[in-house]
Amino acid sequence: MTQVRGAARRTELFDALVDLLLAEGFAQLTLDDLAARLHCSKRTLYGLAGSREQLVRAVVVHFFRGATERVEAAVRAVDGPAAQVAAYLHAVARELAPASTAFFDDVAGFPPAAEVYERNTRAAARRVQQLVDAGVAAGAFRAVHAAFVGDVVSTVMVRIQQRGVAEATGLPDARAYEALSDLLLHGLRA
């Protein structure tokens, strides 16, 4: 029972850290700040990770793991290739919507967190390519070079992740994913 309670407390702390870091970023927050805000000890935080840097990376991993589960659930909830591509990209946008500019700027400026975001961006681009491949095979999308579409989507996703789209257009990441979804779906339909 203690292990279950410990795992639940660990998840609760990671969820609270995700909420805090998404809202405020993390560059300015010390372990003392985090412990005070979460009403726990620094020792408790060190139980989650060995250093502040490792904790930030672990929180970013936790965020993307949960986001991936919810995004895939959104895809499973709909039928048809166009609906699945739309569900995927709209769910990504929903997951990123709570994240502040400070969070994205801090992730971009902290290599361990940037690597996690980049890895998840690559996985998302591969997933979109799989959905497009399935749509072309089913005749729901016109015959396009799915690898090219995947590469274009990947390039845009990387630019979103690296803050290039926000700098060039002023669009927050979540809105940029919405715009990518609209562009992609209107370009693919037969």
Name these PLM-found stretches.
Residues 58, 69-98, 149-153, 177:
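Hydrophobic alpha-helical connector segments
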Residues 21, 30-31, 42, 52, ...:
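Amphipathic alpha-helical segments enriched in hydrophobic/aromatic and basic residues
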Residues 1-24, 28-37, 53-57:
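Basic, helix-initiating cap at the start of DNA-binding domains
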Residues 7, 11, 15, 19, ...:
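Generic detection of well-ordered alpha-helical segments
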Residues 82-83, 119-120, 136-154, 171-175, ...:
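All-alpha amphipathic helical-bundle segments outside canonical DNA-binding/catalytic cores
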Residues 90-130, 137, 166:
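Short secondary-structure transition hinges
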Residues 87, 94, 125-138, 162, ...:
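C-terminal peripheral helix-coil segments that are non-catalytic and often amphipathic
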